[in-house]
Amino acid sequence: MATTGRVLLLSPPSLSSHPEKLNAILKSHTRDKTDLQMLDRLAHGLVSLPESTYDIVLLLTGADNTLAETHSLLNRELIQRVVHSLRPAGKLRNRENKPWGLSDGNGSNANSSRRYNDDEQRFRNEVILAGLVFDDKGELLKPDIGAQQAIPLKLSRRRKEKEKTDTLASSANYSTNGTVGAPSSNGISAPIPAAKTTENNPVPPGVGFIDFSDDFGVPAEDDPQDSDEELIDEDELLDEDDMGRQIVQPPECRPKPGKRRRACKDCSCGLSQKLEAKDKAKRATADKALETMKLGSSELAEVDFTVQGKVGSCGNCSLGDAFRCDGCPYIGLPAFKPGEEVRLLNNDVQL
């Protein structure tokens, strides 16, 4: 089967054990324009296909001369890669070059009435989802989207000028006394009484006005059309029983075990306000506890160790805090020998 353009042969792995069949297939194609790839290597990602390269992709049959093995290996990702390797207007064919018989199922093809297995049905759905379509011959074709061009529609200049002239003439022929001038055969304009205009439509022909009565800027009391409508008070829609009814918390707002309850961003069940009030109460309690721990200037006792001759009354100042009295000036200092000089360096006691 001689073909023009670049051809990609997709072979199932079972065909590799029959080199005589594979060589016979390769002899029917031009070798410099034909590429051969194994479906199992493509499925495992060991090789890749170039995009928009091949005019025809040919699915080869397996060792049993059926496409069952080929269909089982063609998954969704692999089919999309095969479709991307096709050029626009490229075709996906089988080895026998027979119509797929899956285009419409109306009996036009010989194979359209048979029952397909799961792999064939899945293959049909996947190739359609990948972007292939059936042509008139029942072959799978990649549509050429670039060939479709949008043609802008433009009104002719003469038509625009004619419409403008007709509008101006209609406005000019309308007179103030309610008559319309109609040209006669002798060129003299004869007055023709115009149709009586009603109060609902006092608009001359060919002239349009915009009705702003439906705008939101018109107050309700000034709009005669909406004056009879009854206004509903939102507060009357809920009674006391509805206001006192317990709020049902949605499942998504319920906290999971071991986690703190959190409100949604657009919370409408009251959880956000409840958590905010609880946080404020905790913060106020903590601030109040801190205030009780603060000492005033009159409550602070300053111990001056530089004053000479200042000794404790118990005589146990050098033994440590365990032996010192409550008013001992050496509280907080380590034990020392009587008469030893005590120095402070960087707020640390140096004995």
Curated annotation (Swiss-Prot):
Keywords: 2Fe-2S, 4Fe-4S, Cytoplasm, Iron, Iron-sulfur, Metal-binding, Mitochondrion. GO terms for biological process: iron-sulfur cluster assembly. [2Fe-2S] cluster binds at residues 253, 264, 267, 269. InterPro entries: Anamorsin, CIAPIN1, Dre2_N. Belongs to the anamorsin family. Its cofactor is [2Fe-2S] cluster; [4Fe-4S] cluster. The C-terminal domain binds 2 Fe-S clusters but is otherwise mostly in an intrinsically disordered conformation. The N-terminal domain has structural similarity with S-adenosyl-L-methionine-dependent methyltransferases, but does not bind S-adenosyl-L-methionine. It is required for correct assembly of the 2 Fe-S clusters. The keyword Transmembrane helix does not apply. This is Fe-S cluster assembly protein DRE2. [4Fe-4S] cluster binds at residues 314, 317, 325, 328. It comes from Ajellomyces capsulatus (strain NAm1 / WU24) (Darling's disease fungus). GO terms for cellular component: mitochondrial intermembrane space.
